[in-house]
């Protein structure tokens, strides 16, 4: 039965235009591209778009440091990003920029509608201001002495020595990172989006059943803690769009960034002339809209974005497809270890299809982190693609080319086996469609094993030596070629370059519907190597090329001690005053109004403590901490913060930011036990 083609618009999160694409970015773009290519193979009308996120203070300041205009910097970065994505065969229909006229017009339209509908509120807030640069300073653009441990050179939101969190106004001797000047406190009127007004709508959307369970659960936590109004404005100087009717005020980057999805699509519509923008974005649109995003930006896409769309009379997303992070060899990507790998560096040493396949073999519809184990990567690609799939073609093509002038047999040697492959297409299609990529790969490789068993059992190399069995030889090898064709059709969304070479060899396009009709009495091309085995030397070269060049510096001391020297010696009596206890993390949640803090509820053996900890960058999904044991300083004097009372401090190691690691006791430790 012929299905009606769907109209689908697919986006990936917009890469920020101040840095290169790395393998963490590539997980999302590969995942989305596989899904898009599959949908296209099934006859659906799919538009796949992206853009660079090109606004904000970091871009403005980096351009100043480089001595170029922000417009030039983001244009250069856009070209680099597009080259990287093209190298990985990401099949975008359009790649644009948030710094565009389309995005400006749509941002102003959405803001104006929100304001007219009463969803924009004004109020005055106090911020640190750089008198030399004439600009308000974000938290990370202020440094000073920690008010808690008195360590110098700490950021304006948390101390990387003692992990204390605070507001920039609490810093001792604060200085502007931009100019070195002493900032002053200054009031400014800001504009806020009234997110709480959309709480009922958002909760209904959450309960619709479309969202991933993990996303819906996290959203419910946010609803339970209460939604807050969202500051959508920034003061000049700022690289972005000025707010209509508010000179010197600019849209915060996170307002116009998701509107960039619309801007990129509008740009495509205008260039093509045959796509109706409103058919995809109007309130009653029957098109499907999907955003592939990382778990670190769920808050913006599940709350702010649908609320903004609802309040401005546009349609909401059909769904969010959220993925986890990428680790390499079991750890966070590291420049010093050579595992912080840029997309361009990968392509200088290895092919794109290999990474696409490995990611597909590990991806599911859940929000799980993916580990790129480089040794396993080599073994898996060689075992699956070289030894199973490509070898199936090579071991049969030689006989067909040499003995039968490239012509396949008129009949299938084993129709029942071929029917098994046809029947499997339904399950594999469902796996691709539901983003259960690892299941699809497992099923495909199981059938690749079955195909190779067939060839092993039929032993064409033996049949070739037997008189009068030419017809059997042709039928056996033709069967092998046909099974290879089906396998490659299933893998076409994952490995487009290999699929293209397979199509040239088969003299036939690989189409999903074509699986049901085997190639009979058909001429294939002379066989050429379709895919080369990956050698570990290539991977070692990739790692070496990715390492930071630290040899020139030749520091006397390297490692953590160089960055954080030992403190002055203290007496045992002083140490004995510190009461450290094992604590069970009963609950962990984001803190509204802070992009650095987590609120932890700790059980220390019958007593509950509320602790604010500046570890959000390292643990962006706090739900993963629930149930863990950690170590806390239990007799630290409670500290009143603007978010509440913090009743202790959890212990963590690392330089700070994303590179901080919560301490955990060995198995057997119990909440409340003293650390001695």
UniProtKB/Swiss-Prot annotation:
Q: What class of enzyme is it?
A: ligase
Q: Where in the cell is it found?
A: Cytoplasm
User: Keywords, A to Z?
Assistant: Aminoacyl-tRNA synthetase, ATP-binding, Cytoplasm, Ligase, Metal-binding, Nucleotide-binding, Protein biosynthesis, RNA-binding, tRNA-binding, Zinc
Give the transmembrane region(s): none
Residues annotated for ATP binding in this entry? 335
Domain (tRNA-binding): residue spans on this chain: 574-676
Q: Which one of the record's GO molecular function terms can you name?
A: ATP binding
Q: According to the UniProt entry, where does the motif 'HIGH' region sit in this chain? A: 15-25
Q: Which cofactor does it need?
A: Zn(2+)
Residues spanned by motif 'KMSKS' region: 332-336
Q: What is its EC number?
A: 6.1.1.10
Location (main, coarse) = cytoplasm
Q: Which residues bind Zn(2+)?
A: 146, 149, 159, 162
A single Gene Ontology biological process assigned to it is: methionyl-tRNA aminoacylation
Q: Give a yes or no for keyword Aminoacyl-tRNA synthetase in this entry.
A: yes
Q: What is the designated name of this protein? A: Methionine--tRNA ligase
User: What gene makes this protein?
Assistant: metG
């Amino acid at each position: 039965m012929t299905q009606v083609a769907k109209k689908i618009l697919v986006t990936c999160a917009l890469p920020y235009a101040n840095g290169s694409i790395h393998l963490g970015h590539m997980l999302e773009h590969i995942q989305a591209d596989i899904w898009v290519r599959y949908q296209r193979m099934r006859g659906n009308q799919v538009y796949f778009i992206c853009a660079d996120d090109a606004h904000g203070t970091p871009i403005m300041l980096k351009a100043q440091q480089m001595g170029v205009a922000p417009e030039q910097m983001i244009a250069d970065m856009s070209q680099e990003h597009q080259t990287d994505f093209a190298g990985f065969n990401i099949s975008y229909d359009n790649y644009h920029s948030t710094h565009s006229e389309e995005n400006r017009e749509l941002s102003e339209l959405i803001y104006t509608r929100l304001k007219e509908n009463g969803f924009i509120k004004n109020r005055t807030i106090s911020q640190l201001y750089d008198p030399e640069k004439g600009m308000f300073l974000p938290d990370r653009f202020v440094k000073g002495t920690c008010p808690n441990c008195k360590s110098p050179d700490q950021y304006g939101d948390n101390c990387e020595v003692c992990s204390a969190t605070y507001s920039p106004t609490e810093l001792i001797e604060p200085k502007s990172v931009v100019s070195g000047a002493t900032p002053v406190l200054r009031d400014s009127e800001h504009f806020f989006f009234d997110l709480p007004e959309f709480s009922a709508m958002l909760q209904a959307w959450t309960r619709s059943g479309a969202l991933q369970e993990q996303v819906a659960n996290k959203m419910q936590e946010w609803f339970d803690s209460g939604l807050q109004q969202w500051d959508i404005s920034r003061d000049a100087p700022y690289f972005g769009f000025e707010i209509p009717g508010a000179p010197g005020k600019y849209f915060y980057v996170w307002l116009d960034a998701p509107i960039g999805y619309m801007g990129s699509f509008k740009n495509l519509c205008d260039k093509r002339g045959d796509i109706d923008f409103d058919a995809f974005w109007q309130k009653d649109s029957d098109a499907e809209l999907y955003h592939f995003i990382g778990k670190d930006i769920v808050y913006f896409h599940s709350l702010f974005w649908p609320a903004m769309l609802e309040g401005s009379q546009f349609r909401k997303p059909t769904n969010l497809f959220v993925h986890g992070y990428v680790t390499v060899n079991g750890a966070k990507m590291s420049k010093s270890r050579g595992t912080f790998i840029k997309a361009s560096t990968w392509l200088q040493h290895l092919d794109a299809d290999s990474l696409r396949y490995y990611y597909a073999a590990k991806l599911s519809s859940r929000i799980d982190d993916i580990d790129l184990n480089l040794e396993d990567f080599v073994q898996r690609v060689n075992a699956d693609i070289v030894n199973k799939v490509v070898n199936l073609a090579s071991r049969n093509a030689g006989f067909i080319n040499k003995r039968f002038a490239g012509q396949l047999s008129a009949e299938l040697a084993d129709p029942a086996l071929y029917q098994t492959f046809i029947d499997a297409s339904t399950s594999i299609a469902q796996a691709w469609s539901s983003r259960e990529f690892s299941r699809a790969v497992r099923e495909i490789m199981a059938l690749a094993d079955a195909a190779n068993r067939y060839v092993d059992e039929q032993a064409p190399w033996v049949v070739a030596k037997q008189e009068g069995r030419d017809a059997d030889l042709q039928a056996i090898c033709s069967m092998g070629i046909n099974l290879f064709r089906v396998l490659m059709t299933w893998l076409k969304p994952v490995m487009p370059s290999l699929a293209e070479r397979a199509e040239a060899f088969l003299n036939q396009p690989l189409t999903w519907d074509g699986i049901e009709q085997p190639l009979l009495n058909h001429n294939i091309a002379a066989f050429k190597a379709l895919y080369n085995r990956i050698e570990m030397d290539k991977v070692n070269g990739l790692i070496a090329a990715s390492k930071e060049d630290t040899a020139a510096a030749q520091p006397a001391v390297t490692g953590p001690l160089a960055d954080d020297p030992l403190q002055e010696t203290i007496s045992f009596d002083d140490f004995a005053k510190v009461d450290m206890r094992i604590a069970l993390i009963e609950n962990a949640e984001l803190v509204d109004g802070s992009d650095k803090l987590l609120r932890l509820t700790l059980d220390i053996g019958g007593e509950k403590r509320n602790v604010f900890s500046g570890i959000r960058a390292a643990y962006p999904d706090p739900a993963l901490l629930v149930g863990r044991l950690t170590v806390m300083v239990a007799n630290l004097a409670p500290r009143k913060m603007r978010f509440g009372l913090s009743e202790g401090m959890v212990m963590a190691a690392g330089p700070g930011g994303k590179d901080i690691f919560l301490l955990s006791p060995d198995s057997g430790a119990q909440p409340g036990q003293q650390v001695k």
